[in-house]
């Protein structure tokens, strides 16, 4: 473990890149080409240290940032963290009640927000000084960048005796989901920054790479891979404001991207978007990543066949960061790659005993004795949920070569008459049907078996396949795994991170069908599939 994993570690990465390639682009806007070099990043970070120090902000002082993807957002993010304060990224699509709850708990010393997002009214109840983000390349009075760039840089921009230490808080990340009270995940500088070198090595990132990302930078995965991983390697980030199927391949082509990020939802959208791009037209592109949820094998194969672009899968958690990754050249279909050695990942049974290769069990992490899952409590204090060896909530298996394959989330398992069924397995089977473009399986109440298997399916526009035909198709599954009802849907609910929202589907089922729970008689359940959403 690195001796100094505080804020100075990040400052040293920036200084190293600025010294080696001062005029190299650190970040480029995919939309308008605006560029910030490593020399400019280095100088601005030094001015952030002066600005925050003058306001009396230091280690563990919380700075909230509400902004969409932009070069200014990332510059502010790195500036606050490199100065040693605690950056708290908040998704701009939170509702008023969620924001009120967040700021009541967070008690930030400063709130920075993007203008033009109608946030002024939403932030009225927040008891903290507020600053508009502004533009880095344009003089706009009373904005953050007008104030930061007007400061002289700190005298020793790469070494600060007042910087944050390894155990000080680096980031607080807020989930959105469907809860009225978003969960605040707290990571120390040690926990956060020690993830960066392994993930950069795990994905095979080099200084020559130009990484393209569109994902919201309120996510841990985007922050660590695309903001910090790029700086760690002295690479270049091509930053898009948001995902656009119509512009995705054009962005990759125009900016010479070598790595493109993605997730199962965007891969599915691209598959069904009518885009005709091919890897032959993108000679610089090495591979595309997928994370946030297991990528169904059918989608994985279809994407590579249609576009000729290798897909490499990785995984992680908000509480730790990236756990496993694999460069496109070494990928294995279905796997999320090799776990990072420092996290000492194991697959264990319910008693904590390590399982042999190929057996499915609980994914558990270790690495160092004080590893902990920490959350922001209702009173604003940090609560330790668990410490030591920690279970992520994922189910998976390791093969003989150490590659990890995830089978789903433990809390999403369907338990039918004592038999445990992975909904991902059923989804994957349904997705192999030629007319199915999305599928999500959930467990619903059943008077006899406790839970029964129900699948929601989106079919291709104009497809003649109905729910009855899909039930017949599923007869090839073992009888206890086969859905007892299939409901056609126009779309499936997703979380902010693009994951299937099975909880929302289960709640929809309860609302629509709780008064008449499923029966185990196959004839009755096949009689009226309906359309649920």
Specify the residue positions occupied by each region the protein language model found.
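Conserved AMP-binding/adenylate-forming core of the ANL superfamily
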Residues: 26-70, 74-78, 95-100, 104, ...
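Conserved ATP-binding/catalytic segment of the ANL
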Residues: 66, 356-358, 364-424, 431-432, ...
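Gly/Ser/Thr-rich phosphate-binding loop
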Residues: 232, 257-262, 273-332, 344
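AMP-binding/adenylate-forming catalytic domain of the ANL superfamily
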Residues: 477-500, 522-523, 527-530
């Amino acid at each position: 473990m690195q001796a100094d994993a505080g804020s100075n570690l990040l400052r040293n990465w920036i200084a190293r890149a600025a010294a080696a390639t001062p005029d190299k682009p650190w970040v480029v806007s995919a939309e308008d080409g605006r560029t910030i070099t490593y020399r400019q990043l280095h100088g601005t970070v030094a001015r952030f240290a002066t600005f925050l120090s003058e306001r009396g902000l230091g280690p563990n002082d919380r700075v909230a940032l509400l902004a969409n993807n932009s070069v200014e957002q990332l510059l502010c993010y790195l500036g606050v963290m490199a100065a040693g304060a605690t950056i708290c990224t908040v998704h701009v699509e939170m509702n008023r009640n969620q924001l009120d709850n967040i700021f009541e708990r967070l008690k930030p010393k400063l709130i920075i927000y993007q203008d033009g997002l109608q946030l002024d009214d939403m932030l009225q109840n927040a008891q903290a000084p507020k600053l508009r983000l502004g533009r880095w390349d344009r003089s706009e009075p009373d904005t953050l960048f007008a104030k930061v760039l007007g400061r002289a840089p700190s005298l020793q921009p790469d070494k600060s005796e007042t910087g944050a230490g390894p155990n000080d808080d680096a980031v607080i990340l807020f989930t959105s989901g469907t809860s009225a009270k978003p969960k605040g995940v707290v990571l120390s500088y040690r926990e956060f920054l020690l993830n960066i070198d392994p993930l950069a090595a795990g994905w095979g990132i080099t200084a020559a790479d130009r990484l393209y990302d569109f994902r919201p930078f309120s996510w841990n995965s985007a922050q660590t891979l695309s903001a910090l991983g790029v700086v760690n390697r002295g690479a270049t980030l091509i930053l898009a404001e948001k995902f656009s199927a119509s512009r995705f391949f054009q962005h990759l082509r125009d900016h010479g991207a070598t790595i493109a990020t993605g997730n199962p939802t965007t891969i599915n959208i691209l598959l069904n978007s009518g885009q005709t791009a091919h890897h032959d037209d993108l000679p610089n592109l090495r591979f595309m990543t997928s994370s946030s949820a297991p990528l169904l094998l059918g989608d994985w194969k279809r994407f590579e066949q249609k576009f000729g672009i290798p897909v490499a899968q990785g995984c992680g958690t908000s509480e730790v960061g990236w756990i496993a990754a694999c460069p496109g050249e070494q990928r294995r279909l279905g796997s999320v790659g090799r776990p990072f050695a420092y996290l000492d990942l194991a697959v264990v049974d319910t008693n904590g005993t390590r399982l042999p290769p190929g057996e499915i069990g609980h994914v558990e992490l270790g690495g160092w004795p004080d590893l902990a899952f920490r959350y922001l409590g209702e009173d604003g204090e940090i609560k330790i949920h668990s410490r030591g060896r920690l279970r992520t909530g994922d189910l998976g298996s390791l093969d003989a070569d150490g590659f990890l394959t995830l089978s789903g989330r433990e809390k999403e398992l369907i338990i039918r008459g004592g038999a445990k069924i992975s909904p991902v397995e059923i989804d994957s089977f349904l997705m192999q049907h030629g007319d199915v473009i999305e599928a999500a399986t959930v467990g619903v109440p059943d008077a006899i078996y406790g839970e029964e298997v129900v699948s929601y399916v989106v079919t291709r526009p104009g497809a003649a396949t109905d729910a009855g035909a899909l039930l017949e198709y599923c007869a090839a599954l073992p009888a206890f795994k086969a859905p007892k009802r299939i409901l056609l849907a126009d779309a499936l609910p997703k979380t902010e991170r693009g994951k299937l929202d099975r909880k929302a589907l289960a709640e929809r089922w309860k609302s629509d069908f709780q008064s008449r729970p499923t029966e185990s008689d196959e004839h009755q359940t096949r009689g009226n599939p309906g359309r649920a959403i």
